[in-house]
Amino acid sequence: MQTSEREGCGPEVSPSTVPEATLESLPVPTKLPAFDLFNLVLSYKRLEVYLEPLKDAGDGVRYLLRWQTPLCSLLTCLGLNVLFLTLNEGAWYSVGALMISVPALLGYLQEGCQARLSESELMRRKYHSVRQEDLQRVRLSRPEAVAEVKSFLIQLEALLSRLCGTCEAAYRVLHWENPAVSSQFYGALLGTVCMLYLLPLCWVLALLNSTLFLGNVEFFRVVSEYRASLQRRMNPKQEESAFESPPPSDAGGKGALVDCTPAPTPTEDLTPGSVEEAEEAEPDEEFKDAIEEDDEGAPCPAEDELVLQDNGFLSKNEVLRSKVSRLTERLRKRYPTNNYGSCTGCSATFSVLKKRRNCSNCGNIFCSRCCSFKVPRSSMGATAPEAQRETVFVCASCNQTLSK
């Protein structure tokens, strides 16, 4: 220590000799190996080849857990539960020894008993070993190498994004950012510890296996599909009758009469042109008024029943046709056709945004702004019980007349 301090601070050293000493004491920089991104990509692909058996095993496990073949998944779940519950300690040691010895024996037989094949034969068969050798001796052009590097970087970025998302979720649970999730996590950990302490290991493994197979969404989807198919097989007649059954008729003679009404012919269409183009918000209000007034002015239903009893089925059809024709005529008188396509009050042209609306009292065509007054149907002479509650649209002049 003292000699070094003297060498650094002593006045004997001349200034001319200092740079030479520092140059001699500097270490010679070693040449760092160049980073080859293409070799990194090749190493990644070789790693994929080596891990391909594990990837296939993971795909098989996911195939069973997703119940894509329900019978295989069910047999696997039941078989594993039976093994977990019935095997004793000696049997488990035997299973472990078997799982170690079988891969070792297969690898020895594949390597020792296989005949040495030529290069052309290996290229023809395209085994995994050939793929590894191809990756070691691969020669690619510059565009192909750039494409491989880009693909590798994309996969690496996706992997790092998933890892970052997992770490962020773990930190959110540990920092209690969401108390519900954190409480569920720690509750599950405490429950697992208690279960490991109270239950035997075989029961713990059986419960874990049952949770993996029966606690996912795919299992409930398969169960719902099978339940629906069983219901269709057991009750085919009820479904057919449900599709073919007519809608329920109203109580009283009027409902039965309306149900028996035949479909009107094109000459007896009940929807005039002005009613077809009315606003879709309340398409049936105007028809209810006309039908109710027609029912009030129609002859007594008892007289119609007497005529039907006297004249038979043909007279019944004639009565129905006459009733439909009277209703059609009343609708045509009530809703005159306006061929000009403009509002009677403000002369605004109807369009997609400017809807037309019929006044329920005078029958003229207005826009939705001019025909925006609502009055109860009872003010127009309707006597039905629901007429006190239901309202219809009328124009301003009709609103003043009906409000007096």
UniProtKB/Swiss-Prot annotation:
Lineage top rank: taxon: Eukaryota
Lumenal side: 88
Subunit structure: Can form homooligomers (monomers, dimers and tetramers). Interacts with RAB11A (GDP-bound form); regulates RAB11A. Interacts with FKBP8; may negatively regulate ZFYVE27 phosphorylation. Interacts with VAPA (via MSP domain); may regulate ZFYVE27 retention in the endoplasmic reticulum and its function in cell projections formation. Interacts with VAPB (via MSP domain). Interacts with RAB11B (GDP-bound form), REEP1, REEP5, ATL1, ATL2, ATL3, SPAST, SURF4, KIF5A, KIF5B, KIF5C and RTN3.
Function field: Key regulator of RAB11-dependent vesicular trafficking during neurite extension through polarized membrane transport. Promotes axonal elongation and contributes to the establishment of neuronal cell polarity. Involved in nerve growth factor-induced neurite formation in VAPA-dependent manner. Contributes to both the formation and stabilization of the tubular ER network. Involved in ER morphogenesis by regulating the sheet-to-tubule balance and possibly the density of tubule interconnections.
Intramembrane region residues: 188-208
Binding sites annotated in the UniProt record for Zn(2+) 2: C359, C362, C395, C398
Entries under InterPro entries matching the protein: Protrudin, Znf_FYVE, Znf_FYVE-rel, Znf_FYVE_PHD, Znf_RING/FYVE/PHD
Entry keyword Metal-binding: yes
Subcellular location: Recycling endosome membrane; Endoplasmic reticulum membrane; Cell projection, Growth cone membrane
Membrane association type: Multi-pass membrane protein
Source organism of the structure: Bos taurus (Bovine)
Zinc finger (FYVE-type): 337-403
Residues on Cytoplasmic side: 1-66, 110-187, 209-404
GO molecular function, one term: zinc ion binding
PTM annotation: Phosphorylated. Phosphorylation is induced by NGF through the MAPK/ERK pathway and modulates interaction with RAB11A.
GO cellular component: axon; dendrite; endoplasmic reticulum; endoplasmic reticulum membrane; endoplasmic reticulum tubular network; growth cone membrane; membrane; recycling endosome membrane
Name of the protein in question: Protrudin
Keyword terms: Cell membrane, Cell projection, Endoplasmic reticulum, Endosome, Membrane, Metal-binding, Phosphoprotein, Transmembrane, Transmembrane helix, Zinc, Zinc-finger
Annotated spans, Necessary for interaction with KIF5A: 271-354
Transmembrane segments: 67-87, 89-109
Acidic residues biased stretches: 276-286
Gene Ontology annotations of biological process type: endoplasmic reticulum tubular network formation; neuron projection development; neurotrophin TRK receptor signaling pathway; positive regulation of axon extension; protein localization to plasma membrane; vesicle-mediated transport
Spans annotated as Sufficient for homooligomerization: 1-92
